[in-house]
């Protein structure tokens, strides 16, 4: 057994002194004081820090199989554990794509061998993510895939998405969509706006995203499918999603930390660590995302952790791949910028990473109570640390946040009662 002493948990937004007794994989007792006298109890001192439920990230890229030079299941899940995440859902833009039962089983075998946290894999919507032929939804649903997505590309035709949603509704699985109309991206490498004009870099307009969301919410209404929108980035998208929810359509949405924190004006020049898809938008868009998150239009936060090799990101923005890493920095950045400055409560931020994503995807994680799995993270809210690439457990360090000083860093993460990350003393 393990006993976590000298910790604090959130109860209705208030920090309460708490001790947690863990028996095997599950929580046996949560109380302000636990009298457990046994020689076989391992005591973990939380040092007055927050004990939060293990975070749930419904959008990561682990790159394996096929992209191991960028990240592996092992390195990506070590990074997740360092960031406080105990459950991650990897996207299917791997080689091979998890578009058959055989490929999903091969992926699960790899996960069982090296993953440091719980990994719930997506299956693709279309074979090879090519957008021309649907996967076998029934067989893949029976195999227990998390949901269906072609993330990395948008499903380009309404007829294909309509057919996919009908199948997904039939097997009671969500469709998770990267929304991007290829006919409207114009080879862009950042947001189409004043900054892209100043830098002479082709831009992607807001409409490339919002047009596809508008199409898809109507298809979701027609099919009864649960439709989840990845990494919302524009004010128009927020408006469409808000209206869809008011109409009773089963739509949910996520936003990334970088779209909440940065805008096109933060792009210093031709620096590919600021290249992600969707791109950093205008400040008006960022404010709409913050409003949408707080009013419930956007349901949760997901990192879109997208590692790339250093030589890939050293290329100009027009040639470098899209994406930045985020697993190890997400909570500290948002805690520092929004909670410490009084814009959000600590309870709100923790919920965006735990109970909110778990609830919308019907996962029995993201909360701490008697008999639940002992998935948790201990977080130091008071010590400032600098984000340094040499501290990353990910194979990649492609992020614009290197050098930022942040609070709210996890010091220990536990999955099913086993420590999967502990800060070096």
Swiss-Prot record:
* Binding sites annotated in the UniProt record for substrate: 61-63, 93, 277, 308, 322-323
Zinc is among the record's keywords: yes
Q: Which GO terms describe its molecular function?
A: allantoinase activity; dihydroorotase activity; zinc ion binding
Query: What keyword terms does UniProt attach to this protein?
Result: Hydrolase, Metal-binding, Pyrimidine biosynthesis, Zinc
Matches recorded under InterPro entries: Amidohydro-rel (IPR006680), DHOase (IPR004722), DHOase/Allantoinase_Hydrolase (IPR050138), Dihydroorotase_CS (IPR002195), Metal-dep_hydrolase_composite (IPR011059), Metal_Hydrolase (IPR032466)
The record's cofactor note says: Binds 2 Zn(2+) ions per subunit.
Entry binding sites for Zn(2+) 1: 59, 61, 151, 304
Which Gene3D superfamilies does the UniProt record give? Metal-dependent hydrolases (3.20.20.140), Urease, subunit C, domain 1 (2.30.40.10)
Pathway per its UniProt entry is: Pyrimidine metabolism; UMP biosynthesis via de novo pathway; (S)-dihydroorotate from bicarbonate: step 3/3
Q: Which residues form a coiled coil?
A: none
Which Gene Ontology BP annotations are present? Answer: 'de novo' UMP biosynthetic process; purine nucleobase catabolic process
Residues binding Zn(2+) 2 are: 151, 178, 231
Q: What cofactors does this protein use?
A: Zn(2+)
Q: Which reaction does it catalyse?
A: (S)-dihydroorotate + H2O = N-carbamoyl-L-aspartate + H(+)
Ribosomal protein found in the keyword field: no
What the entry lists under Pfam families is as follows: Amidohydro_1
Q: What is annotated as the active site? A: 304
Which superkingdom? Bacteria
Kindly give the CDD domains that the UniProt entry links to this protein. Answer: DHOase_IIa (cd01317)
A cellular component annotation (GO) from this entry: cytoplasm
The EC number on file is 3.5.2.3
- Please name the HAMAP family in this protein's record: PyrC_classI_B
Q: What does this protein do?
A: Catalyzes the reversible cyclization of carbamoyl aspartate to dihydroorotate.
Q: Which family does it belong to?
A: Belongs to the metallo-dependent hydrolases superfamily. DHOase family. Class I DHOase subfamily.
This chain belongs to which protein, by name?
A: Dihydroorotase
Q: What is the source species?
A: Staphylococcus epidermidis (strain ATCC 35984 / DSM 28319 / BCRC 17069 / CCUG 31568 / BM 3577 / RP62A)
The encoding gene: pyrC
